[in-house]
Each structure stands twice: as C-alpha cells, then as structure tokens.
C-alpha cells in the first residue's frame, strides 16, 4: 500500500523522491542525494519506511540503508545500488537497471558514487557524503 502511494506521488507530482513512513509523507523536488542528507540531518525516524526515487546509485542506496527503509522503488537503479540494497535486505524494484550512475553532464561517474565506491558501511558512507557535499558547496553546516 505505502509502496503504491510513494510510486504514485513520484510519478504524478514531479517529485524526485518520496518517503512514506509512520510519521507521514516526505517529498522533495531537489536533485541528487540532497533531500536524503537533509532528512537524515533532521533526525526524522524513517526506520521501516517505504521510498520511491528517480535515480538510486550506490550513494543513495547506502543512505537509504542508513535511514533504515524497508522497501525502495527506483525509476533508475544502478548496479552498485542494487548490490547495497540486497546486502542490507531492502526489498526493491526498479524501472531501468543501469551499469553506473554518471554526473549531470554525462562525462564521468557521479562524484557521490566515487565518494562511496570503497565504502560498504552506511554510517561511514553518510559521513563521507556529507564531507563531499560540503566540499562541493552543496550542503550547509
């Protein structure tokens, strides 16, 4: 039921990601992992939540694992993200499976994917991604 709601909102409201939890529904139109970083930073309890997202690579998958979501649908799921979801027992579905997630200009691997390429621990990934986003000027304090 929650999965259907999350997918429906993602498709019909032009959101980039949607999370349905016991606390309610969180939505965002921000790009990349920024909304996930903000929700984690807010202290929201998202354990057991269901999520729908436009693009999920290794970085986003590690953040979803860190949040404790139980199920995820991605319109585009990177193979690295799929491995993380499997490793953390997160039920998932996708529209398209991509070999890799590239940067916005399509010229290289996404910098967030690079930041977590050798990381498998979600808490460590959160710290590395927070540092990378600060470095790039994408996240304030």
Residue spans of the language-model regions?
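Conserved mixed alpha/beta catalytic, RNA-binding, or beta-rich assembly cores of soluble enzyme
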Residues: 1-75, 97, 102-115
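C-terminal binding/interaction regions
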Residues: 67-70, 82-141
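Short, polar loop motifs at secondary-structure junctions
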Residues: 76-80
């Amino acid at each position: 039921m929650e999965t259907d709601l999350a997918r429906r909102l993602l498709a019909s409201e032009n959101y980039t990601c949607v999370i349905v939890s016991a606390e309610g529904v969180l939505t965002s139109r921000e790009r990349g992992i920024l909304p996930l970083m903000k929700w984690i930073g807010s202290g929201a309890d998202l354990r057991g939540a269901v999520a729908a997202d436009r693009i999920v690579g290794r970085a986003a998958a590690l953040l979803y694992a860190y949040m404790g979501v139980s199920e995820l649908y991605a319109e585009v799921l990177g193979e690295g993200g799929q491995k993380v979801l499997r490793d953390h027992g997160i039920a998932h579905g996708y529209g398209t499976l991509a070999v890799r997630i590239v940067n916005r200009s399509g010229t290289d691997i996404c910098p967030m994917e690079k930041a977590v390429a050798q990381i498998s621990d979600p808490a460590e990934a959160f710290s590395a991604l927070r540092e990378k986003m600060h470095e790039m000027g994408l996240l304030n304090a």
